[in-house]
Amino acid sequence: MKILVTGGGTGGHIYPALAFVNYVKTKEPNTEFMYVGAQRGLENKIVPETGMPFRTLEIQGFQRKLSLHNLKTIQLFLKSIREAKKILKEFKPDVVIGTGGYVSGAVVYAASKLAIPTIIHEQNSVPGITNKFLSRYVDRIALSFEDAAPFFPAEKSSLIGNPRAQEVADMDKSKILATYGLDPEKKTVLIFGGSQGALKINQAVTEFLMSFDQEYQVLYASGERYYKDIQTKVPACANVSIQPYINKMAEVMASSDLLVGRAGATSIAELTALGLPAILIPSPYVTNDHQTKNAMSLVKNNAAKMIKDDELDGRSLKQAIEEIMTNDQLQKQMSLASKQQGIPDASERMYELVKSLIQK
């Protein structure tokens, strides 16, 4: 079997693709893969480290206002379609899977015109412009949230989940917290503002930790940008560990009791696979406010609390955290509700979808 995967720009498009690739390798080790990304996307750093054959296209996104930039965007898109067709004819994949980002638009569209079976994976509750465009041309649409179903043709769509979930679903608590100077036996709150950090979250966490004196622990990944600043402001405390970044995030999540962070699709897939209660702070800077919709899918099922970015400060953060961390019954209820929202066999579902499409 030969599978071409395309998607990029952000980790939310890349990690689900890589998780699926890793799963297929366990099922069919002889499968050949190729990844096609954008020249300037994050995938340029991440994918080559996997050893997978990797090709890039020169492509960029649209701006909301009319501009010369958009004329160039159209030119690059048409050029990318031509380049994608060359790659596809050379590699001859049995199926092409797009996970979002502008590059997947060109590659999946090109594949559809060459009559190669195609699947797109939508990670969010509200689809992006690329997957909306591609939905008219692809054979199958894999959804991560039921809330995304109304945006796509029902006859093409299946609830699959996010393949990243299956990678973390079977993880148990480990001793990893000890590597951050914390007690693996104590209840722990993990606070994470995204790989780059988030100013509003950093300000609220700084206020919250200034007078922290609780029995539970806090592990905060601030992002490199804010690390030195918060280190100078927050007094040393045995129950608090501040790190610029956490490499083994999934393992740390599995060893935590509460997650505080943004409502990106990958984070939600991971925390629901683990049954981890959460306080979600949707980013106000994303397209179509999709993180709020992602968060609400858990809030309405009592699996998470939500604090709007403009309502976040040290006081609101402390109140939300202590409401959960001081109430064992609530914590257990939220954990169960979170687990019920998860799809821990997402990669298997995607694999079965791919096989059914190829054998059709």
Curated annotation (Swiss-Prot):
Biological process per Gene Ontology, one example term: peptidoglycan biosynthetic process
Asked if the Swiss-Prot or TrEMBL record annotates the protein with the keyword Glycosyltransferase, the reply is yes
**Family, per the entry?**
Belongs to the glycosyltransferase 28 family. MurG subfamily.
Q: Which residues bind UDP-N-acetyl-alpha-D-glucosamine?
A: T10, G11, G12, N124, S195, I246, Q291
Top-rank taxon, per record = Bacteria
What topology in the membrane does the UniProt record assign?
Peripheral membrane protein
Q: What is this protein called?
A: UDP-N-acetylglucosamine--N-acetylmuramyl-(pentapeptide) pyrophosphoryl-undecaprenol N-acetylglucosamine transferase
The EC number(s) attached to this protein equal: 2.4.1.227
Q: What species was this sequence derived from? A: Enterococcus hirae
